[in-house]
């Protein structure tokens, strides 16, 4: 089995390694971007250092990647407003057709000769514990890994990244909530190679804590904790979801048991057509309800947390009302979970919140229990509240409690989701505003209309894989 595993990894290693021409071309573009940034800095009233960061700087990028990350490091003495002003000035000078995006502060993204370029301002702090913004850590990450990676370990990292991409858990964006490049590199170094990493993962019992430099003292409530060797108060795996940890464990065991190249290849399911959706809904015998609306004008890393919060709020309230949610999901049009292309933004896209009900309809009345009769003050209040209410049955005593049977506000999940009551469930702020602008409710086989635009999402939903 070892020979078979090594043969598979050898093929992937060769495929994932950029050619000499790829390396030279990317570095030529990176050098040109950095030179232009240095020229733009010369016109500013402050000095700054330009550094290349990320996987392309560390030699751990995989063949076909076309991303260049350049940071402009300003003195910590300037204030945040000046950092943003100077950073955007350099960004727009270097990338005149670029656009601004926002994380903790704005930066410029654009394109140079077919390469996606991020030009990000940060503070040139002495060490990562003195950071003033989250991105200030990045140059420290690059230096830390450059000192520890050699050609062989970099190749092992590329294999690991290709595997994580193949099983759909690579990327620290808030849609994926997977493994970042930096986290992947630390894990491969920690265990000494790709196979050793998989063997360790296969036996993990989360929560798992790793501390590469043995200097962390903070406690984190995450399934995987990897103490940042440049900042002992940070968990590098903080974004990583419990589901993605479990997914990695599943496929680590799978690959070790049956080595094959196919696990290293991203494979979106064949999109469902409308007829496929109708057949799936009919076969399951459930009641799916979809809310479709225009996405708010925010970047995906702001959109996805709000979608999850909104789904959680809706599911909790519907469960409380007796409507059993079997499963739920959020879809964003033109978003397959891969990093956004340069022309992909939230504006102009549709969003779907899908809730599938095992129980979608309830009788007209519901049971409402009061306190035990022996809890005199509360029991008396409950009795008096309903005693003269002709719209309820009771109060009567069942066991030791007062009980009434009262009319339900909503007898169907669809009725609730079509009403103003949805705004009382703790929706994400921007999702609430988007719904207030109007939304469409699709029920049962009518959700087949979503196949045009969400076919891959629906295929993944109705035919789920680990």
Curated annotation (Swiss-Prot):
It catalyses: a tRNA precursor + 2 CTP + ATP = a tRNA with a 3' CCA end + 3 diphosphate; a tRNA with a 3' CCA end + 2 CTP + ATP = a tRNA with a 3' CCACCA end + 3 diphosphate. Pfam families: CAA_C, NTP_transf_2, tRNA_NucTransf2. Its EC number is 2.7.7.72. CTP binds at residues 55, 58, 141, 161, 170. GO terms for biological process: RNA repair; tRNA 3'-terminal CCA addition. Keywords: ATP-binding, Magnesium, Metal-binding, Nucleotide-binding, Nucleotidyltransferase, RNA repair, RNA-binding, Transferase, tRNA processing. One of its GO terms (molecular function) is ATP binding. Mg(2+) binds at residues 67, 69, 118. Homodimer. Belongs to the tRNA nucleotidyltransferase/poly(A) polymerase family. Archaeal CCA-adding enzyme subfamily. This is CCA-adding enzyme. The lineage of its organism: Archaea, Methanobacteriati, Methanobacteriota, Stenosarchaea group, Halobacteria.
